[in-house]
């Protein structure tokens, strides 16, 4: 579980994960605005699980089990641990959990985050809806 003292590390992970995507989609990264958005999400406790490999923190998963779906708020892997199958393995575990509950695994992905969208499509996620800034995707 994420602890309050993890919050700055989580922000840096968020920044590393989304900086290029946000610039591609919105044209710039406004540090003050991004910090405000990020920290406002943490004003109430979030179901965050820090992913560790050995003694290293390498990512985070924020999953909420709702009545009609498992909602994947975030899955972020440190850039130097990406492309090694960790995200795919985590998604498989999350999908198995959703299937055991008999609900789909749902998420949103920014339009400009094509690497993530390709990963989700490869895993079998279907695009359900195109929103203003995101694709809504799910897999059963």
Task: Name these PLM-found stretches.
Residues 88, 111-136:
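Conserved active-site alpha-helix within GNAT-family acetyltransferase domains
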């Amino acid at each position: 579980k994420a602890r309050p003292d993890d919050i700055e590390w989580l922000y840096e992970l968020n920044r590393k994960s989304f900086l290029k995507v946000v610039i591609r989609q919105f044209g710039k990264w406004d540090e003050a605005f991004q910090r405000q958005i990020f920290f406002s999400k943490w004003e109430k406790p979030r179901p965050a699980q820090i992913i560790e490999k050995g003694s290293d923190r390498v990512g985070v998963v924020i999953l909420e089990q709702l009545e009609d779906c498992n909602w994947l708020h975030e899955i972020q892997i440190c850039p130097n641990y990406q492309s090694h199958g960790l995200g795919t393995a985590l998604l498989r575990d999350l999908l198995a959990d959703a299937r055991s509950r008999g609900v789909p695994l749902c998420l949103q992905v920014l339009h400009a985050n094509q690497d993530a969208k390709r990963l989700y499509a490869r895993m079998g996620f279907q695009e359900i809806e195109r929103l203003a800034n995101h694709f809504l995707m799910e897999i059963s």
